Amino acid sequence: MTVPTASADAALRLVRGESAVPHDLLGAHPTTVEGVDGVAIRAFQPNAASIAVVLGEQRWPMERDAHGLFALFLSDRTAPVAYRLEVTFGDGRVVLRDDPYRFLPTLGEMDLHLFNEGRHLRLWEKLGAHVCEIDGVAGTSFAVWAPNATRVSVIGAFNGWDGRAHQMRLLGASGVFELFVPGVGADALYKFEIRSPTGSLRVKTDPYAFAMEQGPGHASIVQAVGTYDWKDGAWLAQRADADPLREPMLVYEVHLSSWMRGEHNRLLTYRELAPRLAEHVKRMGFTHIELLPVLEHPFGGSWGYQVGGYFAPTSRHGSPDDFRAFVDTMHEAGIGVLLDWVPAHFPKDDWALRRFDGTACYEHEDPRLGDHPEWGTHIFNYARYEVRNFLLANALYWIEEFHIDGLRVDAVASMLYLDYGREAGQWLRNRFGGRENLEAVSFLKQLNHAVHSLHPGVITVAEESTSWPRVTHPISEGGLGFTLKWNMGWMHDTLDYFKVDPFFRKGAHDKLTFAMMYEYSERFMNPLSHDEVVHLKQSLLEKMPGDIWQRFANLRALIGYSITRPGKSLFFMGTELGSHHEWNHDISLEWHLLGDARRQGLLAFMQAVGALYRQHSCFWRRDHEPSGFGWIDVSDKEQSVLAYGRYDGSTHAMVVLNLTPVPRAAYRLGAPSMGTYHVVLNSDATTFGGSGFAVAEAVEAEPVPYHGFSQSVTVSLPPMSILVMLPAEQPDARAVVDVLAELVVENAAALRSGAGKSRSKKDKPAKAPKPPKAEKAPKPPKAEKADKAEKAPKPPKAPKAEKAPKPEKAPKPPKAPKEAKAAKPAKPSKSAKAAKQPKVPTAAKAVEPMKQPVATPARKTTTRARKAAAKTSSSPAVRKRTPVSPVPGPSNKKPVTPKSPPPATET
């Protein structure tokens, strides 16, 4: 019997590749012909000479109509029919395959409903490409959102990249096109061919692809269902029970492509990087790493911030399962993994999200809303539910599929303000006449609510560079709901201060104190990030003033200050190397620098301060509570001395910084309690590359009121240094000195055992002198349970003090010494004579370079396409600095200047 002729118009649209509903014609449909019930089967295959229907052992040739469709009527049959198609091509090839148009949709009505409302929390399981089996037939289900397309096809090598072969079905008014393609399996390359409303064809990668190839192809890659065997169950359970705000958080920011490279500048794989990075980070005392975006990006020079594949870990370093193994290795080492995530903008690549279906699909049509003039990128349309769902599901995808412990949300300020980076006339006001992006605000609240409610213990960190209020406050209180916010104001002020010549720092003293005026308005993270060591801003070491000795001393003080002040801390990779160069994303870090004694000292200092930070909860338990911090000496700008206490209810520490090259003998400080204080960290110790200026290892508090306290101590302050003191009644206060000494030796041995074996002779560092043997450190007793002991005394209100005489003018900082002269420590004060300087072994030979198989190439000037302008400060809008004014005590004694700091050979 002859099959009823299909509608000429529908048939022509299908043959021309213009149909959004190919299933209306193709596949098996119940039909009555001449009073006989049966099934009409239609097929379309470009370039086919003939097609036959195969059902079991039977085979029926199909008839070809005038439009190029093949058809067959089977009487006494009912749909569905499990038939196959035998296709014979003009070149004689014969292919037997299942017909993709005989299968039902793979998305249900509820999936589409939730997606169109922006509430589908597992959207990545429905859209994109999914290897699956339907009715015993293996294949891949494809689905994509293209609401204004007139036709969407999936193309690949499996159909000769011909958009007519696998035209997809539009599911109602959802804007989603779907098709199950039998026979397509894992690792197949594919793209979507989209016909726009104007008839133009666009070839796009899948926005939901789990993997992508590198350019110039940019094809999406079908991934099999994840079979990775996770081993971090204990980590995830502990994470869910912990309060991240009351736990230590010292973050190492990493760009995986340039942290370390292999021979001939080869990129290392995720599995190669994982054990090396975990070992290094753990040894340094960091608790977390923060990865610059590993979401697939075409341009390496964007550092990952111009994302092309939001659901695909970059294939530069391996497969999605390789990245899972990377995270698993970190968790096994006790290291959390934060991911830099970019929901603020996307690049204008024609093969990606830009005008995805020929219209402004993910972005705004109006460039005053949809374009970012500074970065040359598009801004997401947060008013569109499907776009919000894309981003929301993406955030949850990284947490659930890759066990990420937190998201650092990039460029939040650009999301919040409609006029961000724009001149007058370049932006549109919101419906209330303001400049706030109300839809972006709503999205950020939705994001934080979903992350924190579904995954307790996972954090979100806002890179928000303005004074937008309540960024880290609960959503129920009108906040955005972030866990932490980068303190950009503190970062800019602190670096500005440390750039100042020490002789003039008294005029910049409030740059260090001002941040405490707004410290508790948000929950802050203190970042010294990648943005501060690029674009001619210089490396951290080169920002420091003075000769080479002073620069390293300044850098140690900066690091110690950053870690011991309130707030969580972040350092960009390479800080520990003390490089003279800015970061270059095209090559490895300069690991060979660890052959230099100064860098060995810097590395040892970072290890020591990291260990001290993790061991003592007073440095992190109350980071975001005013009771966790108190000024001791805030007003001594004449001598550039700053002192503060850190408290934890049961423990406390005293921190004092002397930020000039002039040592201060017998400097008196108010003390929170009576008793003995041990100096547990001294950045001026020779172990760390310091001058070794004599400092008592312990000082006794005296009943002498000072700085508002009932008791005080006198301590000698080395030049350009930070000291940390712990009260003796803390069980491990004295032991920590020996523990840190032992730590330096152990870590040095670890570095020595893995020193770059394949390093070329040219780059091999000179052999450093052998360090003396360290005394065996006693095992520290168990730490006391926090918050159960009596509360540490708070600084009382200061009594009215007698008017203090003006301190004598400090002498000018000494000139850089000549190489021949050795440093002589200044004579210690009477109070320091009884106690000797604590013995800490020199790390000169001990700290050797890590494994680095190739010499570092010459560095090049870095460029960045993502951001052209520096970001503004995150401190409050009113930036007038009002110094804190405690009641002054009697002035300290006249400073004693050492004959000279240690010799410097580097300038």
Map each language-model feature to its residues.
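Non-transmembrane alpha-helical segments in soluble domains
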Residues: 278-281, 327, 395-399, 448, ...
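Short glycine-biased active-site loop of nucleotidyltransferases that positions the nucleotide triphosphate
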Residues: 63-64, 169, 299-304, 348-355, ...
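Substrate-binding/active-site clefts of carbohydrate-active enzymes
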Residues: 209-213, 227, 233-251, 255-436, ...
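Hydrophobic residues within beta-strands of alpha/beta enzymes
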Residues: 51, 152, 289-291, 407, ...
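Conserved alpha/beta catalytic core and glycan-binding cleft of carbohydrate-active enzymes
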Residues: 215-216, 403-405, 420-588, 593, ...
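Carbohydrate-interacting/catalytic domains
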Residues: 1-247, 257, 270-285, 549-552, ...
